[in-house]
Design a protein with these regions (language model features):
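Conserved functional acidic sites
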Residues: 1-199
Length: 199
């Protein structure tokens, strides 16, 4: 059996998400009544090696951490390389991969979308898991072109998981403002509050 050695790189849109620039701070209001700041404290790109049946791959990944010192909490954003740059694919006329996923997680709630070449979220799997809202207002500020992304616990690539006993959660995401609202499957949430002060 021949072993295949693909190399997967990040797309430009995965590398250049301006809303996750290191040092950027955003103010939020939690559903339990307190306010806090999330700051991009880490932004690292690295090569990850993995293997599967007849495949030994190198994958360029990017991890961004948004952290709060009080309360202590963090949101993790991962971009996984899916643009194949392998010489083997060119020589053997294999299908060229063009996957550009973004995964955002907080505690045990995760959200996964495919990005297009402009960084716009798209559905991965079944319909209804990503909705585009023309406008939505949070804490008195109206945002345009917001994406409502369903949490991963309630669907797989083909079906909704109707027997899940937790709440359906949504991530409200803007390409220009980042995370506007993050809901968890245990019923809590936090929402952007522009002009807020955590001092």
């Amino acid at each position: 059996d021949e072993v295949y050695h693909p190399i997967y790189k990040l797309a430009d849109c995965q590398k250049s998400t301006k809303v996750f620039k290191k040092g950027t701070t955003t103010h939020y209001e939690h559903s339990e009544g307190f306010e806090f700041d999330l700051t991009v404290s880490q932004d690292s790109t690295f090569m990850d090696d993995w293997d599967d049946f007849c495949v030994v791959a190198k994958e360029e990944d990017r991890t961004v951490l948004l952290t709060s010192t009080y309360p202590i909490m963090s949101v993790e954003v991962n971009f996984y390389g899916g643009i194949s740059v392998s010489e083997e694919e060119n020589k053997k006329n294999l299908v060229i991969s063009h996957s550009m996923p973004m995964h955002i997680s907080y505690r045990n709630t995760g959200f996964l979308v495919e990005l297009d070449s402009t960084g716009t979220p798209e559905e991965m799997g079944i319909e209804g898991t990503v909705r585009m809202l023309d406008t939505i207002t949070f804490n008195g500020v109206t945002y345009d072109s917001v994406f409502a992304i369903m949490d991963m616990a309630h669907y797989d690539a083909l079906n909704y998981n109707e027997k899940i006993e937790s709440d359906t959660a949504f991530l409200y995401f803007s390409k220009t403002a980042g995370i506007l609202r993050l809901e968890t499957t245990d019923g809590t949430s936090f929402t952007i509050k522009e002009g807020g002060d955590n001092e």
